[in-house]
């Protein structure tokens, strides 16, 4: 490009960021400037001009005056001259401004293509550069203006110059734009090549890594295959050796079996010979033994028979002595058992007598207690004491005089009152005082009297053995609400003394006092009408006594016997 062309070239406003740096954007800007100068400059009222003249006549006058003013005022400004000449060229620019604006509207909102090279071949540039409809419209408008208005040669020359400058500026702009596109395309191509090279290098590096990994894997596989080959070779060698061993063992065992069979045949022959020799020896030995047995059998039988007879005689003598001794012991035992049975019967009779005497005395004492408590029956009680008193005392005297009889329990006159001592059997016998306790309850059912009695019989060389037995029997009456019950519990403890006698070796045994419970139910006070009922106390009803006898014999001394008898009697006085 020359400097003159650059000097007179039209100014280009480049908006690379918004317009995309295209030729169509520059042309659009130039058209906008021309329209600006063509529309804003006139000073004519639009209403008057529209009413008096038609639209086709008014526009050229205004535009011609505007062009002359611009040319005289701004002759040095190329842009203004260009605009004035362009406007003075005819009214087709103004008329077709709307069509130009409509045609260039796609340029105002261009689509940025994906590639700068494609921008050069876009439809906008081709539409702006070569459009036959537009050229024809321009020529038609120019002919109309020329035919309508007379233009001077000077103005035509100026317009020609302006068009030349414009075409040169357009050429330079197009060339510069193409050079920019070329440079941009070269830069883009370089960037794409760089990216492709980087991708190619990365892919190549990846392939190299894969190749290295495959090489390492190949090495490991080769090593494993070599090891497997070694194992296979070693196993094949071992199998060959094992086959050789098996063949050797097979031949050895075949030889050994043959050898063992040969030895077995030899051994069997030897055994047959030995068996034959032994059978002959056995036959000879049996014959010799039979002869010897016949000779010695009689001698041995005689000796054994004599020895057996001696042993049998000795055993029979021993057993006869033992039988005689045991028969004597049996006779002694039978005599002792018979004697003990007689003693037992005598003891039972004495116990029954003593028990009856004690029960009678206790019943009389109980009746005296009832008579003392009731004021209405004092006379009948005194008469009964006078009637039965001497008999009781006579029984007591007879009991004291009889040495074999057991001691009688003393009557209880008042609670917690000791009884006087009594001599039993001889001077060495002493009586232990007895205590009686009586508890009376008036609330519901009964009152009870507990009388423990202990008697002691002693000898010069006797040891004491004590035993306490409690056998209570309580009989109450629930039929009469006003009745009272007195329960007397008697507990006796006796000490037996045994004395050895030289002549008869019999032991003197003490008699234990009876243990009994007497229950007397009284429903009404004792009066003259109840005396026949009180006489029943003399003959009480007897419950079957339970007696237990135990006898023991000591090993070193004669036998000592211990007997205990327990009896329970109850007397009921009922209306």
From Swiss-Prot:
The lineage of its organism: Eukaryota, Metazoa, Chordata, Craniata, Vertebrata. Keywords: Acetylation, Cell cycle, Coiled coil, Cytoplasm, Cytoskeleton, Phosphoprotein, Repeat. The keyword Hydrolase does not apply. It comes from Homo sapiens (Human). This is Centrosomal protein POC5. Residues 545-569 have a biased composition (Polar residues). The modification Phosphoserine is found at residues 105, 109, 564. GO terms for cellular component: centriole; centrosome; cytoplasm; photoreceptor connecting cilium. The keyword Cytoplasm applies. Residues 1-26, 376-411, 538-575 are annotated as: Disordered. Essential for the assembly of the distal half of centrioles, required for centriole elongation. Acts as a negative regulator of centriole elongation. Belongs to the POC5 family. Residues 382-400 have a biased composition (Basic and acidic residues). PANTHER family: CENTROSOMAL PROTEIN POC5.
